[in-house]
Amino acid sequence: MKGSLPAELLEVLERSTTADYVTIDGRGQPVVWPLVPRYQAAEGCIDVTVSRVETDLRVALLFSDAVAMVLVQGTAHPENRGSADEIDVHVLPERVYVWRGSDLDAEPELYDAHVDEVRSAHNEEPEVGHAPPQGGGSVWDERLDALGARHPDAVLAFVGPDGFPFAVRVPVRAERDAGLVLVDADPVGAPIEPGLACLCADAPDRRGFHVLGDLDEDRGVWVLRPHRVADPVHAG
């Protein structure tokens, strides 16, 4: 990865003190929460410390920076750190998506671990599918009313057609009467499909939460039907 990414993008990874980490649980549910990433330039990987929970080895890290929004998809290599509750994970990048200036209307650059650069944002990996929407009605939590006001944006995580988690920071707003969270963007290059999703509203000095539910399209707009709201897990 070090040899393929431009210097200014490597600097984003090096200076970032927070990233949003996405895993997939045994039911195919993506879960995203903020943590402290540790970019290891010499090894070409990103280290994180997470709770000791069984998850898919396909993971993602989203870095939100003024220069660019950078999504790193990779494989997790756990390492026992002698703790009963936590493990260290080395994330080896497979693909890196870059939205310059966090512009969701612009085609992202796609860098692949196997070649220097892929100009198109089209992912060539075979499709393996993902869990379908759970179905059922919305479960509204008063914390959702902060979406669009105290939390004008949030990280939307879902599983792409290749089976890897995908995440992007998007503008959001709550529609209490409809029991929905509206995604006020259709990010170019993001392979969004109906299915299970997780929305994380969390930022410095703003107590956050994450929302698990069904992602679907309603009259040309992506919406999240919430099923559960919880405090995000913070880890180093």
Explain the meaning of each model-derived region.
Residues 1-236:
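Binding-site signature for planar aromatic cofactors or substrates
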